[in-house]
Amino acid sequence: MAQTKIITKENILKAGFLIIKEEGDNKLNARNLAKKLSCSTQPIYDSFKNMNVFHEELVNYVRKFYYGFVSENHNNEKSIYMKYIKNYIFFAKEFPNLFKFIFMENPYKETVEEQKFTSIIIKKISEAGGYSEDTAFKFFMQSFVFAHGIAVQIVSNYLDWQIDKIYLLLEENFESLKLYYREK
């Protein structure tokens, strides 16, 4: 008797992740998922009510990968905040399709998990700089918008700078904001 191949929800999410990473989310559909998994589309629809539900779960799956990535120290940065901002850019450079998927083409709003992650960063800024929470939030938003602009230019192939040059810009922006908020 032939052994039945079991396609799990996790297998399907991994396949979706790989399709986006390698080809972009415009190639993400049930047929391409089935092809990647070497099966029919039936296991996909057995695991997910529809492709919208799959897409929403895949966004969370990719976000978990992103959180793990930016939490690692890829750049030997001592400041948790600069580590995060630099890793955000590094993620965009290393995984442009995944970056686009979760930050540019994602119809789902910020999650509770993202809010917690951001709150931790803001708290660290507040503690390190001696800022109020409101000032730390402004500091975060100003530098994040700056970094996001650079990341978007990277993934859209508008900007092709070396990572060291980008990191220098981020550091200068960081120092400028520290000076600005110190004087307030």
Task: Please provide the spans of the model-predicted regions.
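Amphipathic alpha-helical packing segments from all-alpha helical-bundle domains
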Residues: 106-142, 168-179
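Alpha-helical DNA-contacting segments of helix-turn-helix folds
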Residues: 20, 53-62, 69, 102, ...
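Hydrophobic alpha-helical connector segments
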Residues: 70-97, 140-143
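HTH DNA-binding helix-turn interface
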Residues: 21-25, 38, 45-56
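Amphipathic alpha-helical linker/stalk segments
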Residues: 56, 60-84, 121-127
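Basic, helix-initiating cap at the start of DNA-binding domains
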Residues: 1-23, 27, 31-32, 53
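Amphipathic C-terminal alpha-helical segment
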Residues: 98-101, 144-163, 176-184
